[in-house]
A protein has these predicted regions:
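Sec-dependent N-terminal signal peptides
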Residues: 4-14
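Sec/Tat signal peptide C-region and signal peptidase I cleavage site
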Residues: 15-20
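Bilobed "Venus flytrap"/periplasmic-binding protein-like clamshell domains
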Residues: 21-47, 52, 104-170, 175, ...
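Pocket-flanking alpha-helical
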Residues: 37, 54-92, 167-173, 179, ...
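Pocket-lining segment of extracytoplasmic ligand-binding domains
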Residues: 78-81, 113-114, 139-142, 147-247, ...
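A structural signal for short loop-to-beta-strand junctions that line the ligand-binding cleft
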Residues: 90-104, 231-242
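Segments of small-molecule ligand-sensing domains
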Residues: 233-313, 361-363
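Amphipathic alpha-helical membrane/lipid-surface binding segments
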Residues: 290-293, 297-359
Length: 363
């Protein structure tokens, strides 16, 4: 039955027949495909493996492709990998090749100056409007993962809308005080999105909370608190930095025991050993934007993280009495409404009863 399920997934893969030597990336213009995959393709070619970078719809799509053909390779966000893996067989289906060479960061955007931390977002989730990129995007998947992690906060969001891309999500978030956009990307101070946020009066909210940072998969942390630069320094003005949660970029393939042919299985094992033995520098660009960005990105110390987590928790605690009072008022209102409905029901019942006829008076 499992082989049949994988075959069904293969039929659903966009672009027709898939190849066993695919390195599934993401959008053709995205960082996975243009920045990271070429280095991996080069290293595999040197080891006599003929793998080619292949565009895809992102992490979830890559996982479906590897589930269908264990010899393929996929890039993805660790949080999405953790979210989707159980439904596809987990450790029986996937082998992680690389786990934490580089990280993507989660950004929350709003124009509301009263929202300054994740706790503010969490306690107001039922009243906020959340705008996300498409449902199949890594950003939307990250938000679903955060909802699973924060059952008393963002899980209670009642208004979640998906739009065409992160740029549109940001535009909508900057149009109203009750709106927040979430998106995931590699921190890049040259990216026009960060400039737009600043120019239009918006700000980035640190996506940091104990419920987020405690998440793990197979003993590995899913999110790390990092400080990263989002705007470059200007004359007489330093660059803008933000602290937020970042999730590792994971590289994965299928488990060798799912490869039925003996020679193909051994080749697959050799490929796995080759990639796992590579040094980090061999898989990252040595020059250009990303090498500069990651030199300006640092993981926070435990003490610094605790201070930020406390800010989020304080926001939740301050809101708790108001939330409880709102529940009480809501309960009282419901009880009064129920009593009013019962009275109206009784009044209607009496109105429907026939009026008794009086006996005629004697003449």
């Amino acid at each position: 039955m499992k082989q049949l399920a994988y075959a069904t997934i293969a039929l659903l893969i966009p672009g027709g027949i898939a190849s066993a030597n695919q390195i599934n990336t993401g959008g053709a213009q995205g960082a996975y495909h243009t920045t990271f995959c070429p280095a991996l393709e080069t290293q595999l070619s040197r080891a006599k493996f003929d793998h080619k970078c292949t565009p895809s719809e992102g992490t979830a799509d890559n996982m479906s492709r590897v589930a269908a053909d264990p010899r393929q390779i996929g890039y993805g966000q660790l949080d999405i990998f953790a979210l989707e893996a159980p439904a596809l067989g987990g450790a029986k289906t996937f082998t992680k090749l690389r786990g934490d060479d580089v990280r993507e960061c989660v950004f929350a955007v709003t124009r509301n100056r009263e929202i300054t931390n994740f706790g503010d977002i969490a306690v107001n989730a039922p009243r906020l409007r959340f705008i996300l990129p498409p449902k199949t995007s890594g950003s939307a998947g990250t938000f679903r993962f955060l909802q699973q992690a924060d059952t008393e906060g963002v899980a209670k969001a009642k208004s979640v809308e998906n739009v065409a891309n992160a740029d549109e999500a940001i535009k909508l978030a900057l149009s109203a005080d009750d709106t927040v956009a979430f998106f995931v990307q590699f921190p890049d101070p040259n990216n026009a999105r960060f400039k737009t946020i600043q120019a239009q009066g918006g700000h980035l909210v640190p996506v940091l909370d104990r419920a987020i940072l405690r998440q793990q998969i197979d003993g590995q942390k899913v999110y790390f608190a990092q400080e990263t630069q989002v705007l470059n320094a200007k004359w007489m003005k330093s660059g803008q930095k933000v602290v937020t949660a970042c999730t590792p970029l994971v590289l994965f393939t299928g488990t060798p025991d799912r490869v039925t042919n003996d020679k193909a299985r051994q080749d697959h094992k050799d490929m796995i050993a080759t990639v796992q033995a590579l040094k980090v520098d061999a898989l990252l660009p040595r020059e250009g934007l990303f090498s500069k960005v990651w030199r300006r990105t640092r993981e926070l110390s435990g003490q610094s993280v605790e201070k930020l987590v406390q800010i989020s928790e304080t926001a939740r605690e301050k809101a708790q009495p108001m939330m409880e009072r709102a529940k009480e008022l809501g309960g009282e209102a419901m009880e009064k409404a129920r009593e009013a409905a019962e009275k109206a029901k009784e009044a209607a019942k009496k109105a429907m009863e026939p009026t008794p006829t009086e006996p005629p008076k004697p003449q």
